[in-house]
Amino acid sequence: MPKIFLIKNRLHQQQQRLLESQNLLQHKNQDDERLVPPLSPSGSGSGPSPTPTSQPPPEPQGQGQQVLGQVPDSDQQPLSLTRKRFHHRRHYFGQSRHSLDHLNQNQSPNPNANANPNQIQNPAELEVECATGQVQNENFAAELLQRLTPNTATTAQNNIVNNLVNNSRAATSVLATKDCTIENSPISIPKNQRAEDEEEQEDQEKEKPAEREREKSDERTEQVEKEERVEREEEEDDEVDVGVEAPRPRFYNTGVVLTQAQRKEYPQEPKDLSLTIAKSSPASPHIHSDSESDSDSDGGCKLIVDEKPPLPVIKPLSLRLRSTPPPADQRPSPPPPRDPAPAVRCSVIQRAPQSQLPTSRAGFLLPPLDQLGPEQQEPIDYHVPKRRSPSYDSDEELNARRLERARQVREARRRSTILAARVLLAQSQRLNPRLVRSLPGILAAAAGHGRNSSSSSGAAGQGFQSSGFGSQNSGSGSSSGNQNAGSGAGSPGSGAGGGGGMGGGRDGRGNYGPNSPPTGALPPFYESLKSGQQSTASNNTGQSPGANHSHFNANPANFLQNAAAAAYIMSAGSGGGGCTGNGGGGASGPGGGPSANSGGGGGGGGGNGYINCGGVGGPNNSLDGNNLLNFASVSNYNESNSKFHNHHHHHQHNNNNNNNGGQTSMMGHPFYGGNPSAYGIILKDEPDIEYDEAKIDIGTFAQNIIQATMGSSGQFNASAYEDAIMSDLASSGQCPNGAVDPLQFTATLMLSSQTDHLLEQLSDAVDLSSFLQRSCVDDEESTSPRQDFELVSTPSLTPDSVTPVEQHNTNTTQLDVLHENLLTQLTHNIVRGGSNQQQQHHQQHGVQQQQQQQHSVQQQQQHNVQQQHGVQQQHVQQQPPPSYQHATRGLMMQQQPQHGGYQQQAAIMSQQQQQLLSQQQQQSHHQQQQQQQHAAAYQQHNIYAQQQQQQQQQHHQQQQQQQHHHFHHQQQQQPQPQSHHSHHHGHGHDNSNMSLPSPTAAAAAAAAAAAAAAAAAAHLQRPMSSSSSSGGTNSSNSSGGSSNSPLLDANAAAAAAAALLDTKPLIQSLGLPPDLQLEFVNGGHGIKNPLAVENAHGGHHRIRNIDCIDDLSKHGHHSQHQQQQGSPQQQNMQQSVQQQSVQQQQSLQQQQQQQHHQHHSNSSASSNASSHGSAEALCMGSSGGANEDSSSGNNKFVCRVCMKTFSLQRLLNRHMKCHSDIKRYLCTFCGKGFNDTFDLKRHTRTHTGVRPYKCNLCEKSFTQRCSLESHCQKVHSVQHQYAYKERRAKMYVCEECGHTTCEPEVHYLHLKNNHPFSPALLKFYDKRHFKFTNSQFANNLLGQLPMPVHN
């Protein structure tokens, strides 16, 4: 094969070089052949074809003609290529070789390749020779003619085939072809020979001059016989051409190739074909050669051969196999206009050769002809090349693998969603692949694509595989899962010899990334979300055979992703598994693709290891000088920092990480110092970062957790991988008091993700969830500001962007508390995989080492609770397996990175965790707050120094509270609502967050439930926490002492109790994480996508202006909105802070909101600033000015994706849904996603059979009023009474039974009496659902009970 490819390349070059000479020769040949009058059909066919033959043979000589074996010269050149084709072709032609000499010629050029065909053909050829020496001569002559013309070549083979089949026909056809060519131009033969000689000279690689001479001499000797049989041959030449003209397609002179391919189907009529092919011989030969030989190499005239050269080797094989032209007799020949003279000649020719050749070759060729018999397969051949064209390198196999992967991924996702809870419970010491599976499944669910949890975990407990990527996870080593994301879902195959495989998407995103979509597991929104970087992320070359090699698809766009992946891989490696991440391309910084070389047990300095992650066992893990990412590889430095690529944490970081179980002194980024994040130097892959975070989040964070848990519990590389954001924040505050200012971090987060990709990425709920999951990892060390920031910042600040420096927070006591809390947590976390993930993310985001230590401690205790300390981080990772929770949590929290709504939701969800971690979190939270303030301040200060200064100075505390709160909440809630919420609650901004849901007690309850439902991901988690761990809320209260936390407790508990009861089966069926709180729509037949949660609209709501934010707060967002608004301090602080850094920070928030679908968070004070930012970021495309314009209500609202303009923000918001692949609403029956309740209702009625609109004139009923009106107008000519665009009368339809009424009171009473558990009843206070005309009735309803918390 390689030789063939080389030959193809040579042939390409030679053919191109020969094109000019061949063109001249062909023109001459064409002229000469045209001059030959007797064989007008053959002449016309051969005339043009000889020129193509001259050209095409050089081009396809190795390919097409060698395949044909017709022209020795052509055979000589690309023999190797054509050999395979020819083998197939011959096997299909079944010994349909022209003559032994011709075969020998073919053999000499392709002795090996043609050996089999020749051997197969030898008996037939011997018989042919015995039967008639003329046949051999004719074969030689045919070969010469074939050299001269594709028709002759094809006819020669066809003649052989025909001779085998029918001696008379075959002989006549061969002779006819030769005779026709000779008669047409005996001179042309020499010219053709000359042309061939020239071609041979040019193509000296092919040593057939001697054979040509032989053929020439033989052909000349045979010319007399050919001339005698020219007339016979003419008819059968056409026939033969049709039957054997597969080589001709090579000649695209006539451009009839396709039609000829079609004719291939017909050629069974030999005589008709002979005439038709003679006339359209160039075309028909082109057809066959197209499918067989010329499909790869076009006719000499065209350079298509050059286009197809790589394919021909693979293609021709299958083409010939499938489309071996049946004998001319068997082929149905398209009846082209026959030349009467050629027909007569054909009849003459037929007489002599038919009698001679039929017996000898009929036996041999008939079976091959039978095989070729279904000539209708040739159209299949025509398509087969296309199939094969993708399979240059066994692409067919790859495609099959991809399909299989996609199928497996879907199944895995399905299973993973179901197994999400189990995974938490059954956390193995290895990263829980189920987490990865469930996350993609959740993400897929968020996309509304149904629960295809497609994560195949090569190493079930160990390989961390995000099903979303449809990646094949082949466990390499006990814990390593090498993941090749099918179709370029980045496959950071996680090879963790000792540390457990990191799974993965490129950037360790858990194989659920923008790259993943090709696998079919990912929802399409991923691709739309990815800023074009992820599809290429799959560029990542195959995984290294070594089980420890983790390949990340590294694209320049994937810097952060790859860096994050490398970082998490490195962290995984230091965690105890050698993980070698090979980032393809220069994705990761200086080294090209981030290659994470993590030696298991400390072995494994990266040869390529841009990131060298020493196994935990080997504290002295040498990082290559190139291992700029190594800093990330060390647990100290977030691999996301590898986005900086130059963070030297690699050397010291790795060594420190490995050496220092928990406290690795963090090396500053070579350029940005210890805390690049402090400078706002967040390597922002902006969209990539987020995708990377999503991918990294799952796979990386999980693997880091695993390795941290497995190898070095103290050195938790997950934090390094976890967030470059936290790393940056933490690194700026390397000290336990991370210098990162949470507010600044928020701004940084926002700013880093200012790009338009934010919306795309935000719509990528999975990324958010991964992001959140990743932040969740920091829960353990929520003291580190980057932990808290992680969630908020993850979208914009990828783990790469933020450099989580291992902050040596004084968390030992906290760790003890954490251990105790973890024991409690684990019971709940097992149920909600998110809490552990949050802890993991806290570890990652928090002071990396201390966070790692704490995290390891937490995980240890978690494992003690669930398994053992050895499983600590893995356990945490395995708890993340319900990554959907983290995805939703991360989405919700990221959506509200700056808003307490999600944070509270996550907090509620992680309240138990918060209880467990509350003391530690409180202790570390202040440290983190300081660190985050410093780090975030530094980051934003660097990125937006003035903004940061203003923010820091004016609202430094407020900002800390607000952003830190938001970040902490987001990260806490996302990473581990427990620790983050505890910390946040401990913080003043936590109080703000906690107060967010307390606009009103009832509203807070409703908001808590609504936020839980609206932010199904975060909220579902929160209600889970509230219900299963109401103490978590209490801990949040105790730690945060925030007013909201009690509200969250009561409300979330009530909402969770109410909603979770019904939603658990649904969540399971939809493959959502068990902790999710679902918000029902459409009478309970649809749910708000927990991952999209109002944030998944391509950012419409999260992008909403402040004006729109009010609407959002009114809507399902209102709960989160209220929560955020419930903390006016936060709003004021954020507003003031963001006003100070309005444009930039708003742009950050815009991006975050867009990315995180922060309409929930945007609905709060931050939504005032950031909502403007996000809305305008999307609308105006300019962060600051657009924000002002959008907020000012400019008439120009521009869609950043398609540049459409809208006069109203709501119109833009509605339009943005079109660009979001994460659907806002999911069908509870099938999980299909929709962005509009109108479409959801129309769809769900197909499940329920509700057809409320009945035609009074006939029996028909319809699901939509418009359908009924259209029906009445068209069928019954009944015109409706509504004017154009006039709003119809409100119709209340019971989605359960189809009961319809125009009275809201009747509808409500119907629901209450007949469907008392219908979620629609919970909307009675919503004027959109119940426009009560009777105010007294409405007041009575509202006065009966507190506002329903459900939605």
Curated annotation (Swiss-Prot):
Superkingdom of the source species: Eukaryota
Pro residues bias: start-end ranges: 49-60, 324-340
Lineage: Eukaryota, Metazoa, Ecdysozoa, Arthropoda, Hexapoda
Result after altering residue 305 to M: In ovo-D2; dominant antimorphic mutation leading to the creation of a new upstream initiation codon in isoform D. Heterozygous females are sterile. The male germline is unaffected
InterPro entries tied to this protein: Ovo-like, Znf_C2H2_sf, Znf_C2H2_type
Comp. bias (Acidic residues): 233-242
SMART domains in the record: ZnF_C2H2
Pfam families: zf-C2H2 (PF00096)
Zinc finger (C2H2-type) boundaries: 1197-1219, 1225-1247, 1253-1276, 1292-1315
Basic and acidic residues bias: start-end ranges: 205-232, 262-272
Coiled coil: none
Note on domains (UniProt): Only 3 of the 4 C2H2-type zinc-fingers are required for DNA-binding. Based on its marked lack of evolutionary conservation, the fourth zinc-finger is unlikely to be required.
Annotated compartments: Cytoplasm; Nucleus
Sample GO molecular function, one term: sequence-specific double-stranded DNA binding
Comp. bias regions, Basic residues: 644-653
Site feature Cleavage, where: 445-446
Name by which UniProt lists this protein: Transcriptional regulator ovo
Function: Transcriptional regulator with essential functions in the germline and soma. Plays an essential role in regulating the formation of apical cell extensions such as denticles and aristae, and initiating cytoskeletal remodeling during epidermal differentiation.
Entry GO terms, CC: cytoplasm; nucleoplasm; nucleus
